A protein has these predicted regions:
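Short secondary-structure transition/capping segments
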Residues: 6-13, 101-107, 141-147
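Short secondary-structure boundary micro-motifs
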Residues: 12-13, 19-21, 27-28, 87-89, ...
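Alpha-helical assembly-interface signal, strongest on the long, hydrophobic N-terminal helix that forms
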Residues: 1-81
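Short amphipathic secondary-structure patches
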Residues: 54-116
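Generic short beta-strand segments
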Residues: 117-123
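Low-complexity, S/T/G/P-rich flexible repeat/linker segments used as non-globular hinges
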Residues: 123-147
Length: 147
């Protein structure tokens, strides 16, 4: 039987350390990118939610009419909803997102406002791999209640 001499250990663990270091760095960068993407989407959704709420409350009091059951219901129009959403976005403190735009602001039933916003997300560290960024789009709906 052939036995290896224990004093004949040659080699280096440097490639192993470099490989694990690169793997750890990749995990950290991917984790920070995923967190950044989540926070950017949350900011965009918060803006869309606020714009939808402002648009849902943009009705004129002269348009409020009682239903046959005696409940007061406001009537929203598309121009009012669009103007209120755009006005909210110009005044909102978090509206400095890159490439923020109002895609649509509509009222599907005359009682609720639906706002769709779009933005562009760029990774915080490795943006060289995605120079144009990644497009994000969110939609929020808010209903006006007149009680």
């Amino acid at each position: 039987m052939l036995r290896l001499d224990p004093r004949d250990d040659r080699g280096s663990i440097l490639p192993l350390i470099a490989g694990f270091g690169a793997l750890a760095l990749a995990v950290v960068l991917l984790g920070s990118a995923a967190t950044s993407l989540y926070l950017e989407r949350t900011r965009l959704f918060t803006l869309a939610d606020g714009a939808a709420l402002a648009a849902a409350e943009s009705f004129d009091l002269s348009t409020v009419r009682p239903t046959p059951e005696g409940v007061l219901r406001p009537r929203l129009t598309k121009p009012e909803v669009t103007a209120a959403a755009a006005d909210y976005l110009t005044q909102a403190p978090g509206s400095r997102l890159e490439g923020l735009r109002l895609v649509s602001a509509t009222t599907p039933d005359g009682l609720s406002a639906r706002v769709t916003l779009a933005s562009v997300w760029a990774p915080p560290v490795v943006s060289i791999f995605v120079p144009e960024g990644i497009p994000l789009q969110v939609t929020a709906t808010s209903r006006s209640v007149f009680d």
